[in-house]
Curated annotation (Swiss-Prot):
A divalent metal cation 1 binds at H26, H28, E169, D298. Binds 2 divalent metal cations per subunit. GO terms for molecular function: N-acetyltaurine hydrolase activity; zinc ion binding. The keyword Metal-binding applies. N-acetyltaurine hydrolase that catalyzes the hydrolysis of N-acetyltaurine into taurine and acetate. PTER also acts on other N-acetyl amino acids (Met, Ile, Leu, Val) and N-propionyltaurine, but at lower rates. The gene is pter. Keywords: Cytoplasm, Hydrolase, Metal-binding. A divalent metal cation 2 binds at E169, H201, H230. It is found in: Cytoplasm, Cytosol. Disulfide bonds: none annotated. This is N-acetyltaurine hydrolase.
Amino acid sequence: MSELRGKVQTVLGQIEPDQLGRTMTHEHLTMSFECSHVPPAPGDEGLSLAPIEMKHLHWLQQNPYSHHENLLLNQELEAVKEELLCYRKAGGGTIVENTTTGINRNLPALKQLAKETGVHVIAGAGYYVDVTHSEETRKMTVEKLTDVIVSEVLHGADGTDIRCGVIGEIGTSWPITESEKKVLQATAHAQTRLGCPVIIHPGRDNRAPVEVIRILQEAGGDISKTVMSHLDRSIYDHGELLEFARMGSYLEYDLFGTEVLNYQFNCNVDMPSDSQRVQSLKFLIQEGYEDRILIAHDIHTKHRLTKYGGHGFSHILKNIVPKMLSRGITQNQVDKILIENPKRWLTFK
């Protein structure tokens, strides 16, 4: 679209790409995640309903999706505002807010946070995973889904005039459901019409990212403008990682700060540490992919906020960047990952 070409679209309007600054490409500022509640282990039912307290923090960190209140990030606007002010003070410029239809997107709240903190906030269009799809969504044709997504970018979403600046995170499960496949096809069609950035939440299986890209390609999507999220919990084998990287998407490591013994959504996954994530970044850089790497924290629960003893939105800037530099990643490469790559991805074609 000529009106958006060469621009970035935030909840406060269009800006020039050079205004973005350091960017976290996968975060949530207000959402609810009740759709993904995991029943607590026998004997832990009381903990799952108890207030968030320091004495329960370790249990909460290991079982974040079994605590009802923890899934309600939308209750913490004031805490998130404080976090964003700290993020800006630490050198942050932009947050890509990945909350889509199905997990309580709140565009007026995002606009308010952007106004009050000075942080650029970019909202996401589209739909999350199948379990959050309404009957109305399931009945929509690919053409209708495309029209909805395009309208959320061009005119505003959820009955507001606040416009989304990316499509996503578009949610997929494993195996990908028919409803999710339609949304992926609609995403590709909308991207073709708009020239806009897309970001994907793959199912929790190492085959999922490749399958998503295949569906998008067959539907005419622009893979060079597409981000594959959550690679830190999806692809571990270096050979498989390079095979996927050759497909041309952005490669996002977005769970920095999340270090758990057992990953509740897939016990077969050994969640990497932040040090291991940094080593993965270094490997990809050495293999020639420094122009395709993005990083973030994917904060989507209360316990990840500093208010509750979590790492917060400034963790990468304060802690991970020094670690990257100490492990031989150059300042120029860090700037590519935090500034240049997000800028290229977020700019409409």
